[in-house]
Structure formats: structure tokens, C-alpha cells
């Protein structure tokens, strides 16, 4: 069964020149990139995207980071796309939990600026796709 996921290539990855490498890894994995947009995240979309973290100590810094420069938003499709991308991404903390061979394990330096975001469930994917690509929202 084909599944969709939202991926963000975060501002730190864009600034460090890793967009091509990350997209290449996605394509080599066999996932289809069905939507792609380079943009600076508007504050309202960023706040809605990270709403589950509101009130936590790191939330203001997270919003500042994600809106602080260009990022790439993408929709990926493929069998088990959510799990497949999360495997490519590696653990959230690039130094403590991400293994070499993953995006974060190979290029990540710190937990907050960890290069990429990938949806963690079908429900999250559909909610996030609707935020970043409203015209692709599931009916």
C-alpha cells in the first residue's frame, strides 16, 4: 500500500548545502517525491506544525530556528514511506542516537538543528501535508 509522508529539510541542512544529498538519498531509497517547495516557513504554519510542543522550554527557539531561513518541504510517497524516511533520517539526536549511514548520523551536530523532519504516523502525515501543501490535503 502506498503511503504519504511530509519531510522538511530544515534551515540548517539548506544552509550547509545538504539539500541535494538528502534528496538523492530519498530517491535512492525508492521513494517518490510528489511535491517539493523551497520556502521560508511562515510563523503560523510553523506554530501549527509544532503545536504539540507549545509550552515546552525549547518551543520558542524551535520556532525561531524553523522560520529563520529557507527550508524544503516535500511530500514523499511509497510503500511504508513514513518508516522508510524515518530510517533514512536516523535518531533525533544526531550524536547520541543516530547511527552512521543515516542523514543525521552522517551530517548532524546537535539535537535541535537536526537537518530533517519526517512525519511519525499516518495521522501526523496527513495533518502536516494539509498545513504545508493545502491543495494535497486528503479528502
Curated annotation (Swiss-Prot):
Coiled coil: none annotated. InterPro entries: NDK-like_dom (IPR034907), NDK-like_dom_sf (IPR036850), Nucleoside_diP_kinase (IPR001564), Nucleoside_diP_kinase_AS (IPR023005). Transmembrane segments: none annotated. It is found in: Cytoplasm. The active site is at 117 (pros-phosphohistidine intermediate). Keywords: ATP-binding, Cytoplasm, Kinase, Magnesium, Metal-binding, Nucleotide metabolism, Nucleotide-binding, Phosphoprotein, Transferase. GO terms for cellular component: cytoplasm. GO terms for biological process: CTP biosynthetic process; GTP biosynthetic process; UTP biosynthetic process. Its EC number is 2.7.4.6. GO terms for molecular function: ATP binding; metal ion binding; nucleoside diphosphate kinase activity. Its main location: cytoplasm. ATP binds at residues 10, 58, 86, 92, 104, 114. It catalyses: a 2'-deoxyribonucleoside 5'-diphosphate + ATP = a 2'-deoxyribonucleoside 5'-triphosphate + ADP; a ribonucleoside 5'-diphosphate + ATP = a ribonucleoside 5'-triphosphate + ADP. Major role in the synthesis of nucleoside triphosphates other than ATP. The ATP gamma phosphate is transferred to the NDP beta phosphate via a ping-pong mechanism, using a phosphorylated active-site intermediate. Homotetramer. Belongs to the NDK family. This is Nucleoside diphosphate kinase. The gene is ndk.
